[in-house]
């Protein structure tokens, strides 16, 4: 049964949660650019509405799809674990509002509503309409550049494995279980070199490898300038480079599971 709705509408969520014992909260607005109000109203307030709806309908278990970016502090993460604290500042609204959402879900955990948050990193696989299409589109238009020296390693999450982790997390949510009220990184055991993976993907699409390069420092500076310009001119479109994007494309992000 499908019930379309908006996470900003608490009443709709309550109706959808009626008679349900487990909720998987996956909905969010992704992206590296846009007004704070949009990210906050959906990612944070929407999640708070989900928690409220679960309590109203006496749902027993809530699994949140979070993100490793909630603990991203601007520095590389190499074999990082869940001891990483939330940073005090964020480079864009998405990780900030997702952090607030994750914190709300974990704080809500009690004997009536058991909660857990999963942080899958770079989900990819069949029916992807976000990551892979954007990479291929940029490559075909000649706008894809390697940022940094290409040595950065990242943890990835195949979509079916990420889905399985959510089901396993729900099963593990039992009274007194160690996972209750906790957050966990979710990814494949071995990291890969980001730009090597991108070039393999492009080859499968019949495209040449990325040859144009830009240093991480230059990309960061360009991103900072573009963010300022887009802010001043109130441009709604996404800048081709931001500080967050420069860091994500040039730094290692690997996690110990």
Language-model-detected regions and their locations in the chain:
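Flexible, glycine-rich beta-alpha linker
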Residues: 71-72, 92-93, 113-134
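Conserved Rossmann-fold NAD(P)-dependent oxidoreductase catalytic core, especially the SDR/UDP-sugar
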Residues: 45, 49-93
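NAD(P)H-binding glycine-rich loop region in Rossmannoid oxidoreductase-like domains
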Residues: 4-45, 53, 73
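Substrate-positioning beta->alpha
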Residues: 96, 100-101, 129-134, 148-172, ...
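Active-site loop of classical SDR/Rossmann-like NAD(P)-dependent oxidoreductases
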Residues: 194, 244-257
């Amino acid at each position: 049964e499908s019930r379309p709705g908006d996470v900003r509408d608490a009443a709709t969520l309550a109706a959808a949660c009626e008679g349900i014992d487990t909720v998987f909260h996956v909905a969010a607005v992704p992206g590296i650019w846009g007004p704070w109000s949009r990210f906050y109203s959906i990612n944070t307030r929407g999640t708070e509405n989900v928690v409220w709806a679960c309590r109203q309908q006496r749902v027993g278990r809530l699994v949140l799809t979070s993100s490793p970016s909630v603990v991203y502090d601007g520095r590389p993460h190499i074999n990082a674990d869940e001891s990483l604290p939330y940073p005090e500042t964020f480079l864009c609204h998405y990780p900030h509002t997702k952090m607030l959402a994750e914190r709300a879900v974990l704080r809500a955990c009690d004997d009536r509503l058991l909660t857990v948050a999963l942080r899958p990193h770079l989900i990819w696989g069949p029916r992807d309409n976000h990551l892979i299409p954007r990479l291929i589109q940029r490559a075909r238009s000649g706008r894809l550049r390697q940022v940094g020296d290409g040595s950065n390693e990242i943890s990835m999450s195949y979509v079916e494995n990420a889905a399985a982790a959510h089901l396993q997390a729900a099963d593990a949510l039992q009274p007194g279980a160690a996972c209750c009220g906790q957050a966990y990184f979710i990814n494949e055991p071995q990291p890969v070199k980001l730009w090597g993976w991108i070039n393999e993907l492009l080859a499968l699409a019949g495209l040449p490898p990325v040859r144009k390069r830009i240093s991480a420092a230059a990309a960061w500076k360009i991103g900072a300038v573009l963010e300022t310009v887009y802010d001043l001119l109130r441009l709604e479109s996404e800048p081709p480079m931001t500080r967050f994007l420069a860091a994500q494309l040039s730094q290692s992000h690997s996690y110990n599971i």
